[in-house]
């Protein structure tokens, strides 16, 4: 009789994805981040579920309900700390995962890459609506500023904003629907993740060389299950350390003040993981232009597979493009720094230059470098 994991209709799916999956023998630690993102998602759904049991999505009680969770609920402080800092780790893993994909040419699996960008947008939307829920000053004003961007849409902008607000300002209706969205989206993300994996397993994983690895595959279990477990241990240790020793390190002090529509905080800024996009938004003095730049700063990833000009897949053997890739990493870090700075000289011009370099690298410099490397190597 055949092994149950190979014959049972449900176990067979899990077996083909996690046990007998043929994986390249040379994939490095950069391939760990997919499973780490899965771990982050499970952690966020689990902690979020327990928070939702005690949270109330009403402007009169939202802030105090979060305080109640931290003070009166058994280990509520820990659950909230893990959930809030888990979001930061989620984005660290996402950005490293995307960076890996860009460096090693994994984006040439177009379907997997496209659904990955959709996943990024979903996670960003989830994090945004989640940040509004504690109903602190930065929650309220962040929601006001970001939802107001939709008013830049020609003709229907104003109506669209009021439709999302559920009134004429960010109010109770807004908070209630944001809570509903924040509860729903993680399950949509989980479903999209399954599709992401489905497309990945159609082609198999890429590897650091970017070459075909069909001749040298190893089973996923035990080799990569144990390798992933090491990653899990590192991530959970880091998350627990941050949540226990310095839970408010990445938060904004303004969010310890209950939301007040009559008092605007001196500097409205999002969480650190959105600062690069926020800097790009602010670098354009026109409202509609800024909104389009903000959207395109993420959607430019969709174009990457179509702008691949090199005959080689990975950057492993392409020093010129490697330099441009690390320039992009440095540029995103500069944008992140600028996004948290006030709108004044010299930060404005630095942000504008960094935004220009960001788009130039994706759309012009990296594709041109690919063509140049082909020519140097004499590849037609």
From Swiss-Prot:
It is a multi-pass membrane protein. Gene3D superfamilies: Cytochrome Bc1 Complex, Chain C (1.20.810.10). Binds 2 heme b groups non-covalently. Keywords: Electron transport, Heme, Iron, Membrane, Metal-binding, Mitochondrion, Mitochondrion inner membrane, Respiratory chain, Transmembrane, Transmembrane helix, Transport, Ubiquinone. Heme b b562 binds at residues 83, 182. One of its GO terms (cellular component) is mitochondrial inner membrane. Its main location: mitochondrion. Its cofactor is heme b. A ubiquinone binds at residue 201. InterPro entries: Cyt_b/b6_C, Cyt_b/b6_C_sf, Cyt_b/b6_N, Cytb/b6-like_sf, Cytochrome_b, Cytochrome_b_C_euk/bac, Cytochrome_b_N_euk/bac, Di-haem_cyt_TM. It is found in: Mitochondrion inner membrane. The chain crosses the membrane at residues 33-53, 77-98, 113-133, 178-198, 226-246, 288-308, 320-340, 347-367. Heme b b566 binds at residues 97, 196. It comes from the Eukaryota. Component of the ubiquinol-cytochrome c reductase complex (complex III or cytochrome b-c1 complex) that is part of the mitochondrial respiratory chain. The b-c1 complex mediates electron transfer from ubiquinol to cytochrome c. Contributes to the generation of a proton gradient across the mitochondrial membrane that is then used for ATP synthesis. The cytochrome bc1 complex contains 3 respiratory subunits (MT-CYB, CYC1 and UQCRFS1), 2 core proteins (UQCRC1 and UQCRC2) and probably 6 low-molecular weight proteins. Belongs to the cytochrome b family. Heme 1 (or BL or b562) is low-potential and absorbs at about 562 nm, and heme 2 (or BH or b566) is high-potential and absorbs at about 566 nm. This is Cytochrome b. It comes from Kareius bicoloratus (Stone flounder).
């Amino acid at each position: 009789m055949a092994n149950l994991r190979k014959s049972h209709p449900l176990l067979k799916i899990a077996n083909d994805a996690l046990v007998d999956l043929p994986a390249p023998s040379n994939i490095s630690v950069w391939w760990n981040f997919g499973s780490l993102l899965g771990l982050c998602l499970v952690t966020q759904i689990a902690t979020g579920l327990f928070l939702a049991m005690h949270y109330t999505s009403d402007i009169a009680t939202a802030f105090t309900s979060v305080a109640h969770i931290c003070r009166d609920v058994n280990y509520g402080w820990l659950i909230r700390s893990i959930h809030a800092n888990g979001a930061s780790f989620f984005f660290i893993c996402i950005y490293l995962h995307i960076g890996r994909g860009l460096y090693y040419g994994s984006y040439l699996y177009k379907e997997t890459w496209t659904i990955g960008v959709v996943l990024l947008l979903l996670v960003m939307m989830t994090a945004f609506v989640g940040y509004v829920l504690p109903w602190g000053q930065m929650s309220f004003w962040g929601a006001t500023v970001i939802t107001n961007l939709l008013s830049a849409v020609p003709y229907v902008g104003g109506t669209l904003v009021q439709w999302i607000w559920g009134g004429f300002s960010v109010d109770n209706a807004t908070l209630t629907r944001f809570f509903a969205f924040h509860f729903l989206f993680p399950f949509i993300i989980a479903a999209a993740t399954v599709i992401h994996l489905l497309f990945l397993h159609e082609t198999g994983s890429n590897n650091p060389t970017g070459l075909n690895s069909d001749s040298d595959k190893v089973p996923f279990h035990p080799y990569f299950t144990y390798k992933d477990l090491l990653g899990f241990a590192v991530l959970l240790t880091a998350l627990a350390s941050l949540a226990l020793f310095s839970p408010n390190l990445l938060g904004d002090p303004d969010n310890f003040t209950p939301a007040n529509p009559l008092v605007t905080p001196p500097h409205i800024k999002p969480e650190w993981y959105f600062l690069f996009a926020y800097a790009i938004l602010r670098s354009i003095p026109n409202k509609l232009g800024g909104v389009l730049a903000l959207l395109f700063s993420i959607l430019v990833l969709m174009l990457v597979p179509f702008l691949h000009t090199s005959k080689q897949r990975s950057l492993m053997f392409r020093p010129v493009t490697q330099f441009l890739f690390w320039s992009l990493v440095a540029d995103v870090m500069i944008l992140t720094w600028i996004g948290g700075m006030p709108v004044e000289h010299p930060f404005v011009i630095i942000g504008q230059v960094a935004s220009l370099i960001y788009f130039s690298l994706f759309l012009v410099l990296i594709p041109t470098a690919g063509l140049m490397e082909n020519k140097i190597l004499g590849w037609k």
